């Protein structure tokens, strides 16, 4: 009901700036409900972060890039290479590593909604920080190169890819929203994770990428897979220096 109400109001407003529209919907929701969905999910994520796993440890024992339990600004530096796993990880996959390697959960016990909630909580600690994603290790450079290849690739029955929408057709509309300049001025990397008020969903960039693939009728990469991590790194690196205005964000 909430999503339908907000979407109805948005559509009635016609062709408006997406960011200004999001601000209006956010204010409307805050005035009617008294709290934002993002805040509720962050609180849930905080509880999960401090929950003990089968090993008796909480996520405070995990290193998200700046040392055990250090969260301030950590998400703004991801994806990055981690020595303990010998691979590049983003926030989502690092949370899974934490839950399985440190907390003792079995892979099949890791719930996606819990990963997203914890991602919202950890990301909230990077609000106001600048994006600082590096390409220092060979693993990072190799994954970035894969991300570049995937971003510019065209395939499928429609002969389209990421760059079709987000380079060639920037500013044009296929629906309500214009295609974002994800490699340039829009700094789209700083827009996720986010609450999508149009469909009442909580998404990280992994979910956003999978949805994009679905929109162009391509098979969706698996969660936490190399293709998703590669595209994330390719999107994050150009955003270096951009300030995270608000994580988790509130978007259409």
Q: Which functions belong to the PLM regions below?
A:
Residues 40-41, 142:
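An amphipathic alpha-helix/helix-turn recognition signal
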Residues 14-40, 50-64, 68-117, 124-128, ...:
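Electron-transfer interface patches adjacent to heme c in soluble/periplasmic c-type cytochromes
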Residues 129-146:
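Solvent-exposed, charged amphipathic helical/linker segments at domain boundaries
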Residues 1-9:
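Bacterial N-terminal signal peptides
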Residues 118-125, 134-138:
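Hydrophobic, well-structured mid-protein blocks that either form specific transmembrane helices
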Residues 2-3, 33, 135:
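Generic detector of short alpha-helix boundary/capping microenvironments
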Residues 10-12, 47:
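Intrinsically disordered low-complexity regions specifically enriched for long asparagine
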